[in-house]
């Protein structure tokens, strides 16, 4: 049971060191063709689309960085640390004008429009004038030594090895002192977070295609490259003009994770119970985040949107107590901390201490939310409103014991994903309906 003391220990973990993947011996190399799924979300082929995208001079015709590394895995029975040391050395030998090697320079990128901004950086739609390629440029605000920024660039180069219809394509990265600029595939239809907030809850049929894309994408990242995403949430799942669904912003760079100041606040709302309690991050933590995301998209609101105050403020919410009872199992939980009337009044006056939850104007302090995730039953879809296999899928994702929770690869074999993968859903029409 978390207590106020536990809250103090949680805050001490905000240096994010624990978010880095442990460098343990890696499994034998996995053939990318064995893990890349045969079915693709949408009528068009993501692979054929990728072939039309302008490639940089540092990328081979097959789309991979010209390095003697197969599928991002060490081909010798050495440790993960040895693999990363070798890769870093190989990338260091490329000459440190990474932007020149990738033919990406700030002066060659013409800004077309602003796509978004936050504490961590900005995203703009740009035109690479030399190739005529439209890209999304993400500028990450980093307060770090030049040597750390260069190390981040080296770590990001493994993204050139990621080749999947479920992963947003990466064109390259360069320094624009003091920040890091990353250029990626432009996804015309926004993130799932922006889509459901504008158009309302997403249908079970589309949610099925989302489950297919994310489970296969996470499987590819981990099985082929030993990458754990670490930040699965609707705002990191994007849709392009053909209705294809792809994941982005995965944790390939440990230095980048450590350098972004708001990482803890940004990811904690989707964090698994074991991660909140300080355990090592694993690929099963991504599965928990996927389960929370599917509920959020299907209901059109964040599933943990529970008020920290008493019921007299319920009239201000955009959902009812009956709605809450359907998503918080088994019923609307009692407050985690018993508060006296004076304390309730004090909390009302100190409202800015709370955070606005995804998909809701509702506020709950980060500590209260973390206590809720650890101590209360996990959220669930309202019984009877969604397909049975969808309910079962979400319940498996949200098993609180990580030993019982499936891996992304296990999810790809679940009947919900198999059925959704085979279902004829016009994703192009879905995308066309979003103006």
Swiss-Prot record:
Residues 1-61, 307-359 are annotated as: Disordered. Residues 46-59 have a biased composition (Polar residues). Residues 109-417 form the Protein kinase domain. InterPro entries: Byr1-like_cat, Kinase-like_dom_sf, MAP_kinase_kinase, Prot_kinase_dom, Protein_kinase_ATP_BS, Ser/Thr_kinase_AS. Pfam families: Pkinase. It catalyses: L-seryl-[protein] + ATP = O-phospho-L-seryl-[protein] + ADP + H(+); L-threonyl-[protein] + ATP = O-phospho-L-threonyl-[protein] + ADP + H(+); L-tyrosyl-[protein] + ATP = O-phospho-L-tyrosyl-[protein] + ADP + H(+). One of its GO terms (biological process) is MAPK cascade. ATP binds at residues 115-123, 138. GO terms for molecular function: ATP binding; MAP kinase kinase activity; protein serine kinase activity; protein serine/threonine kinase activity; protein tyrosine kinase activity. The active site is at residue 231. Its EC number is 2.7.12.2. It is an enzyme of class 2 (transferase). Keywords: ATP-binding, Kinase, Nucleotide-binding, Phosphoprotein, Serine/threonine-protein kinase, Transferase, Tyrosine-protein kinase. The keyword Kinase applies. Protein kinase that is necessary for a-locus-dependent processes, such as conjugation tube formation, filament formation, and maintenance of filamentous growth, and for a-locus-independent processes, such as tumor induction and teliospore germination. Belongs to the protein kinase superfamily. STE Ser/Thr protein kinase family. MAP kinase kinase subfamily. This is Dual specificity protein kinase FUZ7. It comes from Mycosarcoma maydis. The lineage of its organism: Eukaryota, Fungi, Dikarya, Basidiomycota, Ustilaginomycotina.
């Amino acid at each position: 049971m978390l207590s106020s003391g536990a809250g103090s220990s949680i805050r001490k973990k905000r240096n994010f060191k624990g978010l880095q993947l442990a460098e343990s011996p890696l499994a034998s190399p996995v053939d990318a063709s064995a893990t890349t799924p045969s079915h693709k979300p949408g009528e068009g082929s993501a692979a054929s689309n990728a072939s039309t995208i302008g490639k940089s001079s540092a990328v081979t015709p097959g789309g991979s960085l010209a390095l003697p590394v197969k599928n991002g895995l060490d081909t010798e029975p050495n440790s993960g640390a040895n693999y990363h040391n070798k890769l870093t050395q190989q990338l260091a030998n490329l000459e440190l004008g990474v932007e020149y090697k990738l033919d990406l320079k700030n002066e060659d990128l013409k800004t077309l429009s602003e796509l978004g901004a936050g504490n961590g950086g900005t995203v703009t739609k740009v035109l690479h004038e030399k190739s005529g390629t439209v890209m999304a440029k993400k500028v990450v605000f980093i307060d770090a030594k030049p040597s750390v920024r260069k190390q981040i660039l080296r770590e990001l180069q493994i993204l050139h090895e990621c080749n999947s219809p479920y992963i947003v394509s990466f064109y390259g990265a360069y320094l624009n002192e003091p920040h890091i600029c990353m250029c990626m595939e432009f996804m015309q239809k926004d993130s799932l977070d922006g889509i459901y907030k504008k158009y309302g809850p997403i249908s079970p049929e589309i949610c099925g295609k989302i489950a297919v894309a994310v489970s296969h994408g996470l499987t590819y990242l981990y099985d082929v490259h030993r990458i754990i995403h670490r930040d699965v949430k609707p705002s990191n799942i994007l849709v392009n003009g053909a209705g294809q669904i792809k994941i982005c912003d995965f944790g390939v760079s440990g230095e980048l994770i450590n350098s972004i100041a708001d990482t803890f606040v940004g990811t904690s709302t989707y964090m698994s119970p074991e991660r909140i309690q300080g355990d090592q991050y694993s690929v099963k933590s991504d599965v928990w985040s996927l389960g929370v995301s599917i509920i959020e998209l299907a209901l059109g609101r964040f599933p943990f949107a529970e008020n920290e105050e008493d019921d007299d403020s319920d009239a201000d919410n955009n959902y009812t107590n009956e709605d809450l009872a359907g998503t918080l199992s088994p019923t609307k939980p009692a407050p985690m901390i018993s508060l006296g009337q004076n304390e309730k009044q004090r909390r009302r006056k100190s409202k800015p201490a709370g955070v606005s939850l995804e998909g809701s104007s509702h506020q709950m302090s980060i500590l209260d939310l973390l206590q809720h995730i650890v101590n209360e039953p996990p959220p669930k879809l309202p019984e009877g409103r969604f397909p049975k296999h969808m309910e079962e899928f979400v319940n498996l994702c949200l098993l609180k014991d990580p030993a019982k929770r499936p891996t992304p690869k296990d999810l790809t074999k679940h009947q919900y994903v198999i059925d959704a993968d085979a279902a004829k859903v016009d994703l192009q029409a879905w995308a066309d309906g979003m103006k």
